[in-house]
């Protein structure tokens, strides 16, 4: 590719020093937990992706090494190796000075992800050690850093090479990442696979060299976002082949791919310069506006909508739609709303996407007449269903107080005394007997109890109007009081935490899954905000002695049980809990409800695409994918009820025996 290489020493601009990064890492990577740890990798990978995005290189390799460090290698141009205007080697400037990156000069990149340039130095500052190896101009150069970014060597020429590119290896600092410095293959694979879908020329290889965890995955999609849509819709009944539109407008490149399926919810994923905009923005608005306008015009042209009929709503048109919107915006036009860069603010992007879709979609609808007519009819059906559900939703919102009173009068909800919605907790408890113990054992100031008596509907396969007919779900909607579906407003929630408390058996697990499916599909902001939890009652109670000498201990896993048995010695009584109802109110409070001693699992969505696919696989209509997934992931043994804590894949995100973060 014959391009002028303007990625030179003087195109790197220096803005400020690095001192603040180690003091306040959260300002730069969001957090110092598992999420922040993996963010370090994305920062380096995004620099390599920017090279590919601008036409240099086509391969990135990410390797988790045996010692727990990680290497990211690309075949781009290689970082500049000369002396910077400040008098230091340019590579050293890139890795030791905040905001020293190609993005900030005009010569380096035409388009790049929003954080490019900050990445390298922040990663260095938060690493125990870092090593960079550069292949450029026929030479290999290396430089080492230690103790959070201090140069251990200068930039040294170490050999000859015929290739170009950059390799960065680093080990995260355990003083910063106190909870974990262990990389998770699956978390990395989700983000890397996404990048490969968005850049069809790019091949990404992810390798794990750690003992007992060895594996490798390669991501390379020649059809790009077309394959991305197929991936998201896997396991669903699709109504047509994936459709793609591409075009330019206002200097912005637009790529759109979409496909309808037989489900009732929409899934729109948008990206700017290969970075996910999870909160949408102007590009999504442009897509939705054009789609709604073109569909309504077409529906009137084929006489499915008469003059007296009102226009179809965008939500109705998008029912069952999966779409990927990818835009590439020149650096000078790039604007985000807020600090997180998760919502695009560039106004030109709206008109760019609108004009590309408005130009191409009418031709597509005309060409696929039969399909288009069925999609219009599908939208009209959705409109009718929405009207039916609207009344129920209005009851849920405008009649909130009356309904809440009705719920109280019907004896279901035992409310908290406090009106402090920032502190109040709602326990959804399986069955009446456990609900009774929970009512007596709770802290009535801030804990409310809602026993679930009947059958919870599988919301993956149901329309909203049917969901409102399910008494258990309806009661939950009214109790939380923040609406449902597209009307859900997290700020209206009556509770800061929703805690699901069920027996530790297969029925309990099934209820958990049904409730989580509902929250994921119809109250997603609650899950995204980390406000849905699963309570973890103990599996065993051990008792020894009598009267004043009586000792009572609880165990949550077989390992804990073994340790307690050794500690207590002989002569103890062991009780295996089969259900919550076997505990008296004091025991339930002490083990499962007391913020000082309880253990909660916070339900978190790391990757919405994969979570959504998993929900479809496990809760959808198709039996074969479900059987295949269960055979691959579930081990059937002789143990009747194994603790969830024994599963190494489940992360206990909040063990409140040790930490309890209260909002005052």
Curated annotation (Swiss-Prot):
Q: Which GO terms describe its molecular function?
A: ATP binding; DNA binding; DNA negative supercoiling activity; metal ion binding
Q: What is this enzyme's EC?
A: 5.6.2.2
Matches recorded under SUPFAM superfamilies: ATPase domain of HSP90 chaperone/DNA topoisomerase II/histidine kinase (SSF55874), Ribosomal protein S5 domain 2-like (SSF54211), Type II DNA topoisomerase (SSF56719)
Q: What class of enzyme is it?
A: isomerase
Q: What is this protein called?
A: DNA topoisomerase 4 subunit B
Function text: Topoisomerase IV is essential for chromosome segregation. It relaxes supercoiled DNA. Performs the decatenation events required during the replication of a circular DNA molecule.
> Which NCBIfam families does this UniProt record tie to the protein?
parE_Gpos, PRK05644.1
What is the phylogenetic placement of the source species in the record? Answer: Bacteria, Bacillati, Bacillota, Bacilli, Bacillales
Source domain of life is Bacteria
Feature type site, description Interaction with DNA: 455, 458, 510, 626
